[in-house]
Amino acid sequence: MFKLVSEFEPTGDQPQAIEKLVEGLNRGMRFQTLLGVTGSGKTFTMANVIARVNRPALVISPNKTLAAQLYQEFKTFFPENRVEFFISYYDYYQPEAYIPTKDLYIEKNADINDVIVRMRMSTLKSVRTRRDVIVVASVSCIYATGDPNDFDRMNIKLSVGERLDVFELAEKLAKIGYQRTEDVSLSGCFRIRGDTLEIYPTYQDEGIRVEFFGDEIDAISLIDRFNRTTLERLDKVIIYPAVEFVTTEEKLRRAIESIKEELRERLAELKKQGKVLEYERLKQRTLNDIELLETMGYCPGIENYSRHFDGRKPGEPPYTLLDYFDDDFVVFIDESHITVPQLRAMYNGDRSRKKNLVEYGFRLPSAYDNRPLTFEEFLKKVGQIVFVSATPGDFELSVSEQVVEQIIRPTGLVDPEVEVRPTRGQVDDLINEIVKVKQRGERALVTVLTKKTAELLSEHLTELGIKSLYLHSELDAIERVEVLKKLRRGDVDVVVGVNLLREGLDLPEVSLVAIMDADTEGFLRSETTLIQIIGRTARNVNGKVIMYADRITNAMKRAIEETNRRRRIQLEYNKKHGITPRSIVKPLEIEVFEQFMVKEEPAEYGDTIKNIFSMKESLSLEEYVALLEEEMYRAASELRYEDAAALRDELFRVKETLKKKKGR
């Protein structure tokens, strides 16, 4: 079924890791962890495991950047199989919200990326019709999508000789989301020319031409979308829905009755509570939606009524991509130390935003059920999971029936030496080290604790003739990748930032990582963070890490010990096999953003920082402090360190205000 294509054979630790993981899956182990260091070829190991077990696979990545990277790699490994890409289709997303203190209602505002819509529809079709499928997804795969049973039922089967006329087919297509148009560059549409109807599905590049002779199908062809030439003659074809959410007329009728019933119950509650404004608001908004549903079959914000369309009870989980797979699919959670906390956090972030919408009469309580899965629901919907990380979290390690280590790098590259130097004179010492790196034609990364420090240090380095840029949270994902491309090309010698882990991109030109104030206790200098930062130089033969600190914290001690353990294993392997370490040489490819027009949207993982700060006015200072602390630790657990640092700074300010108030 799966055919893995590669000029390389598994080597180093890869063969034993592949054997153990395959054996674990075949023996029915529910949870396993692949603990693989940076540069050890974890993706190649995953590809080999998938090829060996021959089962559909879902690979979940913590962000779109890494998902797009993995998608490219799996496409290369499996050119003859279906490799699909499933991420949030929003280029920009402002969720619906209400801020009571300002009486401010914010309408949902979104910019949808048509390329990603096509890739999502291609995913749904592939997963429902084939078994040789690998889907690379972001955590948005646990958000609601259409009912897979409707997707199966509402397809249109056509065959040559079938009795059907062109207008009957047009009517059928309209019912599954296709629109009539003359613009053939659009997907999810059809056009009619005489006795010929051309269909342009969302899930494939090719179009389908259906030619009629009276009320009979005379010919079916696969055609080139742009020059409309015939690619292949077909005897029959199946047309799948053009959109994720499709429904039958019977389901629509039942949904409208169910919405009316819920509205009656909710209005009675609001009347009993004496909430006159909320009563009138909800009544007017919902009746308007019902009228649109009855006349058009659609209304803005229709997703908030999804429970009624699906026939779900209150609190029941929505349908997601997971429901489209066969029961035996395998899940790989990449960078699990980041992805698992994200999967845990998404439900609460979504519910807290909707609370005001429901309480103040903007939405019915059923809006709560248009949501991502809880972590417990996610675990119930999947079977076997392989967690993949260089630094697995406590959850992964506690539930895994086996932890498979992949320490050895095929390139022979050794984990960098870690030096601890005093903070006194640290900037001058750092400059000397950067100059040495620059003379070798290599690059450096410097991680600091605050955005202000990053800015000042970067400016200081520039004044001294060292080409420097700093990464900060105001840069969007594309701009951040552009900064790192400049570093790789040599346009920049050093990049300074608070969070240099966010991209997870390969930077083989980097031979020096400097960690300023390494002995500061906190999430920015935890054991996991330090090991991840150290790994940034593990792709260069001259890799070195300098920690500037006046004492050795427990986190530093554990990170250094683990790095030294990995160094020893690799050095022994190199000596035994006569391997001379060599730096990874990686071409500057077309970036995934340019290829897929992928943009990160900060709102994908729950409330944005701005939304959190805006809640200050509707909470007491004590409640606001509790919220800030909770969100700060959540951001830190997801390695969103710039967000965590912004929340920390706000927390300090509010605590200072609270202290002054109590001191009066």
Curated annotation (Swiss-Prot):
Its main location: cytoplasm. One of its GO terms (biological process) is SOS response. One of its GO terms (cellular component) is excinuclease repair complex. GO terms for molecular function: ATP binding; ATP hydrolysis activity; DNA binding; excinuclease ABC activity; helicase activity. Pfam families: Helicase_C, ResIII, UVR, UvrB, UvrB_inter. Residues 622-657 form the UVR domain. InterPro entries: Helicase/UvrB_N, Helicase_ATP-bd, Helicase_C-like, P-loop_NTPase, UVR_dom, UVR_dom_sf, UvrB, UvrB_inter. ATP binds at residues 36-43. SMART domains: DEXDc (SM00487), HELICc (SM00490). Keywords: ATP-binding, Cytoplasm, DNA damage, DNA excision, DNA repair, Excision nuclease, Helicase, Hydrolase, Nucleotide-binding, SOS response. It is found in: Cytoplasm. A motif (Beta-hairpin) lies at residues 89-112. Residues 426-588 form the Helicase C-terminal domain. SUPFAM superfamilies: C-terminal UvrC-binding domain of UvrB, P-loop containing nucleoside triphosphate hydrolases. Residues 23-180 form the Helicase ATP-binding domain. The UvrABC repair system catalyzes the recognition and processing of DNA lesions. A damage recognition complex composed of 2 UvrA and 2 UvrB subunits scans DNA for abnormalities. Upon binding of the UvrA(2)B(2) complex to a putative damaged site, the DNA wraps around one UvrB monomer. DNA wrap is dependent on ATP binding by UvrB and probably causes local melting of the DNA helix, facilitating insertion of UvrB beta-hairpin between the DNA strands. Then UvrB probes one DNA strand for the presence of a lesion. Forms a heterotetramer with UvrA during the search for lesions. Interacts with UvrC in an incision complex. Belongs to the UvrB family. The beta-hairpin motif is involved in DNA binding. This is UvrABC system protein B. It comes from Thermotoga neapolitana (strain ATCC 49049 / DSM 4359 / NBRC 107923 / NS-E). The lineage of its organism: Bacteria, Thermotogati, Thermotogota, Thermotogae, Thermotogales.
